[in-house]
């Protein structure tokens, strides 16, 4: 029986370990949303996301539609993971030193600025102009999924460069949401949020490691920001940035305590039966506690949340937001609409041009150097993959447009650009690797 269960589990475990699997699940959720939106069950599909759900009590609770709970609540978990990744990268990653950080920062800045300018050039007037932030984003799950298909053909440094670029890109998108896509701000609630944030920072500086402390105050921060007019997703990033990055035990303490309890475990010896002797169990539990304390809260949470976000949060978001009614009679009109063109051209042209040009400038003036084993053709290919906006672009489009026609046109532009960018980026990087091989 155990063999049969293992036999059934193995294919799933292998799939979830593969780097491209997150993009595959996200693509599946998107296709399902499009199929449902254009099926006989279209009405039920859209109605389902408008069901109201109350969390709390009669006089102390939050009532939102299911769609809003996903965009404001569930996506806060995604942004929390973004905050954790940002902190790790700035402390001990590709963004830890000035010279290392300059290339992805410059590339991300160009990859945000040029698409926004292209969109604004095509849509200079309000209300269409409000969508300028949509083509600024990169979907890291899809982009890394395409790179994973080229495993063995591209350098590891190129994958690290794309990851760092996408993380900086996410930070830029968060700032854009906070500054330009939040509602009317309630100053009193923002002051309460600031006090909560300062308490969280103080807890971090004082060495508080309890995740209950950060979880409780973090939830309060999310609720206050939700009520303040500032988009609640910002709370996720802020909480992620204050999670402790240093473990309770240093390397020497971990080694000493591990050796101590391993020696005790060996002394007790093996006991008959499936259950451990009380002292032996105590040694095992102590080892478990030591291993827990040897890993920082930041790394542990990032590790534990990664799969839940990639295979749960983001696909659910896509399922709720990617539903687009495609009518053949209006398709030509929709494709040629300025919002559709602005989003599509911003992602398809603006992203690669901005990333390539700003990378070239930063290398040319001596601020940084290209990653080892990377050519300018590789950077151009990464720039094209940056045009896969998807998750964050869909998120911003929901904030930019209340008008359903404009929102749908923005989604159409995102879909067109993301598909073409994925195919073109794969082709360019494949040819670049083939040239190196020869």
UniProtKB/Swiss-Prot annotation:
Q: How does it sit in the membrane?
A: Multi-pass membrane protein
Molecular function, one GO term: sodium:proton antiporter activity
* First-listed, main subcellular location of the protein, grouped into a coarse class: membrane
Cell compartment(s), UniProt: Cell inner membrane
Catalysed conversion reaction: Na(+)(in) + 2 H(+)(out) = Na(+)(out) + 2 H(+)(in)
Would I find Zinc-finger among this entry's keywords? no
Keywords, in A-Z order: Antiport, Cell inner membrane, Cell membrane, Ion transport, Membrane, Sodium, Sodium transport, Transmembrane, Transmembrane helix, Transport
Pfam families from the UniProt entry:
Na_H_antiport_1
Q: Which InterPro entries match?
A: Na/H_antiporter_dom_sf, NhaA
One GO BP annotation of this record: regulation of pH
Membrane spanning segments where? 21-41, 66-86, 102-122, 130-150, 160-180, 183-203, 206-226, 308-328, 341-361, 376-396, 410-430
Q: Which Gene3D superfamilies match?
A: Na+/H+ antiporter like domain (1.20.1530.10)
**Could you tell me the superkingdom of the organism this chain comes from?**
Bacteria
Q: Name one GO cellular component term.
A: plasma membrane
Keyword Cell division appears in the UniProt entry = no
The UniProt function text for this chain reads: Na(+)/H(+) antiporter that extrudes sodium in exchange for external protons.
Q: Which family does it belong to?
A: Belongs to the NhaA Na(+)/H(+) (TC 2.A.33) antiporter family.
Do you know which NCBIfam families this protein is assigned to? NhaA
Protein name (record): Na(+)/H(+) antiporter NhaA 2
- Organism encoding this protein: Syntrophotalea carbinolica (strain DSM 2380 / NBRC 103641 / GraBd1) (Pelobacter carbinolicus)
């Amino acid at each position: 029986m155990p063999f049969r269960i293992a036999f059934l589990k193995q294919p799933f475990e292998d799939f979830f370990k593969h780097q491209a699997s997150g993009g595959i699940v996200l693509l599946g959720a998107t296709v399902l949303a499009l199929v449902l939106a254009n099926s006989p069950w279209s009405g039920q599909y859209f109605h389902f996301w408008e069901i109201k759900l109350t969390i709390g009590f009669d006089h102390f609770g939050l009532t939102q539609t299911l769609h809003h709970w996903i965009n404001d609540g569930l996506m806060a978990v995604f942004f929390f993971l973004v905050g954790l990744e940002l902190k790790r990268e700035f402390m001990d990653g590709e963004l830890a030193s000035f010279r290392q950080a300059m290339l992805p920062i410059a590339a991300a800045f160009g990859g945000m600025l040029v698409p926004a300018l292209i969109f604004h050039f095509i849509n200079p007037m309000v209300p269409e102009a409000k969508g300028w932030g949509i083509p600024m984003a990169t979907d890291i799950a899809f982009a890394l999924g395409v790179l994973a298909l080229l495993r063995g053909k591209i350098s590891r440094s190129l994958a690290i460069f794309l990851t760092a670029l996408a993380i900086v890109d996410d930070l830029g998108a968060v700032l854009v949401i906070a500054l330009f896509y939040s509602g009317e701000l309630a100053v009193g609630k923002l002051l309460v949020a600031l006090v909560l944030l300062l308490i969280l920072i103080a807890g971090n500086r004082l060495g508080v490691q309890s995740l209950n402390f950060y979880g409780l105050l973090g939830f309060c921060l999310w609720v206050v920001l939700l009520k303040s007019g500032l988009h609640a997703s910002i709370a996720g990033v802020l909480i992620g940035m204050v999670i402790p990055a240093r473990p309770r035990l240093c390397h020497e303490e971990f080694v000493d305590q591990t050796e101590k309890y391993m020696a005790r475990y060996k002394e007790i010896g093996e006991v008959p039966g499936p259950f451990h002797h009380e002292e032996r169990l105590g040694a095992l539990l102590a080892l478990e506690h030591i291993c827990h304390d040897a890993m920082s809260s930041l790394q542990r949470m990032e590790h534990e949340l990664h799969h839940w976000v990639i295979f749960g949060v983001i696909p659910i978001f896509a399922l709720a937001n990617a539903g687009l009614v495609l009518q053949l009679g209006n398709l030509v009109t929709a494709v040629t609409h300025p919002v559709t063109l602005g989003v599509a051209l911003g992602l398809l042209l603006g992203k690669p041009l901005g990333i390539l040009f700003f990378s070239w400038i930063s290398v040319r003036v001596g601020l940084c150097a290209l990653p080892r084993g990377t050519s300018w053709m590789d950077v151009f290919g990464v720039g094209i993959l940056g045009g896969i906006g998807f998750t964050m672009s869909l998120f911003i489009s929901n904030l930019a447009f209340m008008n359903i026609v404009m929102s749908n046109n923005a989604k159409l532009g995102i879909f067109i650009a993301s598909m073409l960018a994925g195919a073109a980026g794969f082709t360019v990087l494949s040819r670049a690797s083939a040239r190196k091989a020869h």
